[in-house]
Amino acid sequence: MSMFNVHRKEITWGGRKLVLETGKVARQADGAVMVTYGETSVLCTVVGAKSQKPGIDFFPLTVNYQEKAFAAGKIPGGFFKREGRPSEKETLVSRLIDRPIRPLFADGFRNEVQVVCTVLSHDLENDPDIAALVGTSAALTISGLPFMGPVGAARVGYVDGAYVLNPLVGDLPKSELDLVVAGTVEGVLMVESEAKQLSEDVMLGAVMFGHREFQAVIQAIIDLAEECAKDPWDLPEPPAEVAVVTGKFNDAGVPAELAEAYKIIKKQDRYAAVGAVKKKALALLTEAAEIAVAGGILKHLEADVVRGNILKTGVRIDGRDTKTVRAIEVEVGVLPRAHGSALFTRGETQALVVATLGTGQDEQIIDQLAGEYREHFMLHYNFPPYSVGEAGRMGSPGRREIGHGKLAWRAMRPCLPAKESFPYTMRVVSEITESNGSSSMASVCGSSLALMDAGVPLPKPVAGIAMGLIKEGTDFAVLSDILGDEDHLGDMDFKVAGTVDGVTALQMDIKITSITEEIMKIALGQAKDGRIHILGEMNKGLDHARDSVSGNAPRITTISIPKEKIREVIGTGGKVIREICEQTGAKIDIDDDGTIKVASVDADAAQRAIDWIRGIVAEPELGVIYNGKVVKVVDFGAFVNFLGSRDGLVHISELARERVAKTADVVKQGDVVKVKVLGFDDRGKVKLSMKQVDQTTGEDISAQLEAERAASKRERHHED
């Protein structure tokens, strides 16, 4: 009899088998589910602390997604040969899992919860992210933790006008859409997508298609939970101090004072006024237990003020209605030495965005389970503490910065020129210099402007807008271009980026149990209106790409050579190509198909490198004169290097017009000479002549020599 009490559910989903199994691995975790989709397997575990840490006024949820190299039969690189810090993908998938599960934990639950998803097998066809999200939902559902799930998730593609459920990794490049949607039976909680300028209707259809298709997964999780779910945790009753403190605040008029403070339009002044009200409110309390619950109560009071005003009057914190976008100011070319730059300001949110162009040598090499590849477009988002008027830690980017940068990257990528027509590596850096909401979308707008300022031929400008939602019962209001407070106190963060023709990126996070198709449709339509308005403001600064790349950027010239000549251009151990780069100052990239990219800020340097390469691959032509260098002197002549790495022999009889006794009397190693191709011997070796070329002018004097010989011959004949 087995020592394991295994429970297993299996369904066919998207043409592949999905298996949920628990009871064999990681049995000491509160919940552990092994998910297998195709031959991709992910172990998802959940552990909750049995008690709440004192003084915690937030929900401490941590999600760690990790990919093990052995899952794809690989050994990690590097000196230590083991997995190290999380990769960008691991960070992004961790956020992808966190976002739909966080709002489903019971209000007031403050125990620490840790989710760990470990990729144990990867078939290189089914991306582990969907399996990890499904497994996390299943593990939480059976754990007994106060999780109001389960959650389902699916990836949606769009090929030839039809939606595709969970497209294979190899099929995604053919898809016009890569969308991940997660939600409950009732509605959608999270969307993350990249699209090739698709309409709002197509995007909404994809979301609802995914929602329908993952219902089978939710049912499988429910069936598993009915067999093996642990007893639900007992939630502690709200402390008695909550009612006491709420009463004290109401009696002291704190809600009314907060309402007055939130009428101040300027962010810093408003924060100061709100802070003063909170300080005054806390002074009413003397007991430690009362102070411990005061923060949460004040936040609820703030939310009631902000949300109530919007739903009742349609007027927001800064005086706008629900559809108005803040004032926009655009400047381009703000940094004199940068290849492209833009300062994008929208209200109190500002991004300084800089584009830099490089060569193939600057591409980022990314090593993933699916294999190594090179990325020629990078977008990095930085959020320094001064942008919100604070002093804080500076260091490597956090999860939020990585996620925001990737969202802007997704928004821009569908509109970038093909690598074949624009062979530059592009790096965009967005420095957030002021922030009051929608900084990631400001990064999209600034990136579009900076790239066009750098001369990157974008077919159309790209803009982004962040939408919000206030929902109470059946009443709701969709907000365009949300402020930071509207994000924190609202029910939705819905970001849409795209061109005048369609959507390129969409990200949605819901903080309530779910939203309906009706709300999403209104939000998408309102976002389109806002995006078109923003594009119009951007066009006032720059409406199309510069005619050429910046004068500070390298100029890349592409030439092609026969593949069999690549070895000659590179040389033994890279000797030849290194010499070309060192002598000319140009950068050279050689592809396996014989495509060569020569880059240099100095056009003359690039041309010298091109001429050198063409000389190497050119075949010597009979009767043509070339410049060369003597590389070896022997008794019977001199070997001369010409046409790059090609050598030929100048026989001693072809060194000079007069008779030569010793080769060294005429040339020495290192001499620069002019030679004419006389022909080729049986082995393909080149026969050269110096005497048939005027070494000063480079002119062909063979006719003159022939005439002299003929005259000399006639003279001898006459004498005879």
Swiss-Prot record:
It catalyses: RNA(n+1) + phosphate = RNA(n) + a ribonucleoside 5'-diphosphate. Residues 623-691 form the S1 motif domain. Mg(2+) binds at D487, D493. Keywords: Cytoplasm, Magnesium, Metal-binding, Nucleotidyltransferase, RNA-binding, Transferase. One of its GO terms (cellular component) is cytosol. Residues 706-720 have a biased composition (Basic and acidic residues). One of its GO terms (biological process) is mRNA catabolic process. PROSITE patterns: KH_TYPE_1 (PS50084), S1 (PS50126). Gene3D superfamilies: GHMP Kinase, N-terminal domain (3.30.230.70), K Homology domain, type 1 (3.30.1370.10), Nucleic acid-binding proteins (2.40.50.140). Its EC number is 2.7.7.8. Pfam families: KH_1, PNPase, RNase_PH, RNase_PH_C, S1. GO terms for molecular function: 3'-5'-RNA exonuclease activity; magnesium ion binding; polyribonucleotide nucleotidyltransferase activity; RNA binding. It is found in: Cytoplasm. It is an enzyme of class 2 (transferase). InterPro entries: ExoRNase_PH_dom1, ExoRNase_PH_dom2, ExoRNase_PH_dom2_sf, KH_dom, KH_dom_type_1, KH_dom_type_1_sf, NA-bd_OB-fold, PNPase. Residues 695-720 are annotated as: Disordered. Belongs to the polyribonucleotide nucleotidyltransferase family. Involved in mRNA degradation. Catalyzes the phosphorolysis of single-stranded polyribonucleotides processively in the 3'- to 5'-direction. This is Polyribonucleotide nucleotidyltransferase. It comes from Paramagnetospirillum magneticum (strain ATCC 700264 / AMB-1).
